[in-house]
Amino acid sequence: MQHLQEIIANATSAINAAESLVALDEVRVQYLGKKGELTVQLQSLGKLPPEERRTAGQEINVAKEAVQKALAERKDALQSAELEAKLAAETIDVTLPGRRIENGGLHPVTRTIERIESFFGELGFTVESGPEIEDDFHNFDALNIAADHPARTDHDTFFFNPKLMLRTHTSGVQIRTLEERQPPLRFIAPGRVYRNDYDQTHTPMFHQVEGMLVDENVNFAQLKGILHDFLCNFFEEDLEVRFRPSYFPFTEPSAEVDVKGKNGKWLEVLGCGMVHPNVLRSVGIDPEKYSGFAFGMGVERLTMLRYGVNDLRAFFENDLRFLKQFK
């Protein structure tokens, strides 16, 4: 019995001295393992006289239970200490400010489209849309574009078949709107268009806004006045604007519109003209009664000029360093 008390005392001392679960398990093995001191005591019961075995066995079991209890208590204490240390290491200071959600921003091309829509909306122009996959009638024929015009070739246009293509301009929306409604009409048609070209100033997909006004007694002076006011509003300065004679199949007369930059050079910004009588006839409108003007502008072109961007491709490369400048 005195020997068992010594084992219990040694075991208890070793258990209390264990500073980790690994060290505690080593103590368990030392006293309760297959070759542990208390296990050896149980195995030696067979050597005792029968009349002593029962009492000795009870004493050994009491000692074993005492060691097991001490092990369990120490294990609980070590696990609690380990958990507290882990929680302390992961403590969050709830008084610290939270992480701010990063604010998004409109793409510069979207900003430009909205700015254009806002200006013309104040003049009573509606916003119309149409399919990006267009047929040859709405993309070419109804716009007075000849069968041998270069725009009808694979070099310029993405064809699905001879009669179906990705639209090369939003002028098809103008034709569809004229088919569905009768004058007086004033509307703009913003959207994506596609052409087979890719370099510093061209991409296969880009955005256009085309506008049209059809009514009685519409003249070129009205067109000039609206576009002059639009450009001064868009660039937020009193610009010098000039109209140069040009040619488009769907307008007559036609003009290119330039603005004078700060360096004194003229910069082309859009095209315009009076709607060609053949275009009106193609949609059943009498050109003797009604006249109209049309204009078209490249959104990326205007955006580049407004924000001083030199490479058109930057708008489509999704570089956050570039896009964050426009928040």
From Swiss-Prot:
Keywords: Aminoacyl-tRNA synthetase, ATP-binding, Cytoplasm, Ligase, Magnesium, Metal-binding, Nucleotide-binding, Protein biosynthesis. Mg(2+) binds at E252. CDD domains: PheRS_alpha_core. It is found in: Cytoplasm. It catalyses: tRNA(Phe) + L-phenylalanine + ATP = L-phenylalanyl-tRNA(Phe) + AMP + diphosphate + H(+). Binds 2 magnesium ions per tetramer. GO terms for biological process: phenylalanyl-tRNA aminoacylation. One of its GO terms (molecular function) is tRNA binding. It is an enzyme of class 6 (ligase). GO terms for cellular component: cytoplasm. InterPro entries: aa-tRNA-synth_II, aa-tRNA-synth_II/BPL/LPL, Phe-tRNA-synth_IIc_asu, Phe-tRNA_ligase_II_N, Phe_tRNA_ligase_alpha1_bac, Phenylalanyl-tRNA_Synthase, tRNA-bd_arm. Its EC number is 6.1.1.20. Disulfide bonds: none annotated. Tetramer of two alpha and two beta subunits. Belongs to the class-II aminoacyl-tRNA synthetase family. Phe-tRNA synthetase alpha subunit type 1 subfamily. This is Phenylalanine--tRNA ligase alpha subunit. It comes from Vibrio cholerae serotype O1 (strain ATCC 39315 / El Tor Inaba N16961). The lineage of its organism: Bacteria, Pseudomonadati, Pseudomonadota, Gammaproteobacteria, Vibrionales.
